């Protein structure tokens, strides 16, 4: 499947009299990583769920550039790995196919486990894995779905710094040629992985896309351009939150 551009137009979300965000319009370019940042409660996860078709906006629409439905072309990776504890790592990777009653491509599972460095524990249960290994298994499961659009809600936030850096690099390498939207609270992570940044202001929220990144992700953690971008983004986040 070819990754489309996602167009968000005049999107509003209200809960009773409370406005979460109002008339958001922006594009998510095809085959790029986009990071969505903002304070807690700004509506980042709600916005991602609307893009995924898991929630309805009060007003507005989300469309693909080719006019085809988005939902069948989406994969989701969240902060929690959501591995089934009674299944092996191998069976967790192919969980989507199992739930849909499809034949499991075992060669593809084996190839993905090799790519994420988990071939040696394919028959193990999740309880025996470290946090980083569990997230690598979740990444392999996301890749098995082979969707052109991947939505990620803070998938690396619970990991230690070194493990997070390694898995960021792995995800960036394995999710090339896909449209990726990543929610993160970490300016370093956003600047390291993204082609473009979107900052969501607190309610009633707006979108600020004025921050520009140079170079190609994933950027080295000591890249001077990344460090400058991180500082500028932190200032932008502070402005967005008053």
Task: Describe the role of every protein-language-model region.
Residues 6-8, 20-23:
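Conserved structural motif at the start of ABC-family nucleotide-binding domains
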Residues 104-121:
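Conserved ABC ATPase "signature" region
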Residues 59-74:
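Conserved ABC transporter NBD signature motif
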Residues 144-148:
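A short, proline-enriched helix->beta-strand linker immediately N-terminal to the Walker B motif
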Residues 125-129, 133:
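Conserved ABC ATPase signature
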Residues 37-39:
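The feature captures the beta-strand-to-loop junction immediately N-terminal to the Walker
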Residues 52:
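Helix-to-loop junction immediately C-terminal to a conserved catalytic motif
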């Amino acid at each position: 499947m070819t990754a489309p551009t996602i167009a968000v137009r005049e999107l509003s979300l209200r809960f009773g009299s409370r406005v979460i965000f109002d008339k958001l319009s922006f594009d998510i370019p095809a085959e790029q990583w986009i990071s969505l940042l903002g304070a807690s409660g700004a509506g980042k996860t709600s916005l991602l769920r609307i893009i995924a078709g898991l929630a309805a906006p009060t007003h507005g629409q989300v469309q693909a550039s080719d006019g085809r439905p988005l939902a069948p072309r989406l994969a989701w990776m969240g902060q929690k790995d959501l591995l089934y504890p009674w299944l092996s790592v191998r069976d967790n990777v192919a969980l989507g196919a199992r739930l849909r009653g499809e034949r499991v491509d075992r060669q593809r599972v084996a190839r993905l486990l090799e790519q994420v460095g988990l071939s040696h524990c394919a028959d193990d249960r999740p309880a025996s894995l470290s946090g980083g290994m569990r997230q690598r298994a979740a990444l392999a499961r996301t890749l098995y779905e082979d969707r052109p659009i991947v939505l990620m809600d803070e998938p690396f936030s619970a990991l230690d710094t070194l493990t997070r850096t390694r898995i960021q690099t792995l995800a960036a390498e394995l999710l090339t040629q896909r449209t990726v939207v990543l929610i993160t609270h970490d300016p370093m992570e956003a600047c390291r992985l993204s082609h473009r940044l979107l900052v969501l202001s607190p309610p009633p929220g707006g979108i600020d896309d004025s921050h520009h990144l140079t170079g190609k992700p994933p950027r080295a953690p000591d890249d001077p351009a990344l460090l400058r971008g991180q500082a500028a983004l932190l200032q932008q986040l502070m402005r967005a939150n008053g």
